[in-house]
Amino acid sequence: MLEKFARYPLTFGPTPIEKLERLSKHLGGNVEIYAKREDCNSGLAYGGNKLRKLEYIIPDAIASNADTLVSIGGVQSNHTRMIAAVAAKIGMKCRLVQEAWVPHEDAVYDRVGNIMLSRIMGADVRLVDDGFDIGIRKSWEQAIEEVKAAGGKPYAIPAGASVHKYGGLGYVGFAEEVRKQEAELGFKFDYIVVCTVTGSTHAGMLVGFAADGRARKVIGIDGSFTPAQTKAQVLSIAQNTAKLVELGKDIVADDVVLIEDYAYPAYGVPSEETKEAIRLTARLEAMITDPVYEGKSMQGLIDLTQKGYFEKGAKVLYAHLGGAPALNGYGYAFRNG
């Protein structure tokens, strides 16, 4: 479905799928849990899911003759780290807006982890006190205008690379990649579990798996704590992406499966249950998840498995999207492990 779109390679290639034997057994052994390791997808500043999206956005940035990538996220945004990394790799400047999306007060929160890496890679990082919102932000639009006023040529990439005309394409490719891996494995996954916030990862998967009738087998775990806005954004991105790739099927609201039970108490703030999920996965599989995204989707996967959401014998693919550098901003929460 993606043959007609330009792609700038930023990743190693297909990401590995591994069976989480010990976690599956710990949760009763009735469900086979696998992980697709998007967190291991590149040598660019620890990688992660945003690179798969950016592979289809960067050709447009280069064609526009831009000299500066301009993007936005929270203080510990994985996305802005990846924008800084890609800018360094392709020889562009980088302007980042880091908003106060998370009510978290670790003493070094704005000096370690993702934001530190962005600074090391040369990005112009600006902290802004505005709160969480997955939509288009005034501070980002202002940054774009400031780059222009200084004589630069900005290329605007929204939060999560999501509300961008090509934002959903990368995860259509994820679905196509999984189908090829399923052919090698000799079975198909019954469910795909993914964390959902700005929406284009989920939306791209939804479109990609709609091609073989599995759109509603993509189970989004909300991490935004604003689920109505998130669900609407997933639907909008999916519908736009379906048109772009000429899916030939309509995407409707019921195709967006979003479970809202695990985002509490706020975006970016881990509950005790999220922290326990992070510890459990680390101690059983040495697979590191973060407090903002993957810890919450892992909490959801664990709880849904224990509740019997997945039928006995189901094969569940957990999409590990990355994000471990953010753990550095939560050192006090994990000071005892």
From Swiss-Prot:
This is 1-aminocyclopropane-1-carboxylate deaminase. It catalyses: 1-aminocyclopropane-1-carboxylate + H2O = 2-oxobutanoate + NH4(+). Catalyzes a cyclopropane ring-opening reaction, the irreversible conversion of 1-aminocyclopropane-1-carboxylate (ACC) to ammonia and alpha-ketobutyrate. Allows growth on ACC as a nitrogen source. PANTHER family: 1-AMINOCYCLOPROPANE-1-CARBOXYLATE DEAMINASE-RELATED (PTHR43780:SF2). Its EC number is 3.5.99.7. It is an enzyme of class 3 (hydrolase). NCBIfam families: ACC_deam. It comes from Bradyrhizobium diazoefficiens (strain JCM 10833 / BCRC 13528 / IAM 13628 / NBRC 14792 / USDA 110). One of its GO terms (biological process) is amine catabolic process. It comes from the Bacteria. Keywords: Hydrolase, Pyridoxal phosphate. The gene is acdS. The active site is at 77 (nucleophile). GO terms for molecular function: 1-aminocyclopropane-1-carboxylate deaminase activity; D-cysteine desulfhydrase activity; pyridoxal phosphate binding. It holds the Pfam family PALP. The keyword Mitochondrion does not apply. Belongs to the ACC deaminase/D-cysteine desulfhydrase family. Homotrimer. Its cofactor is pyridoxal 5'-phosphate. The modification N6-(pyridoxal phosphate)lysine is found at residue 50.
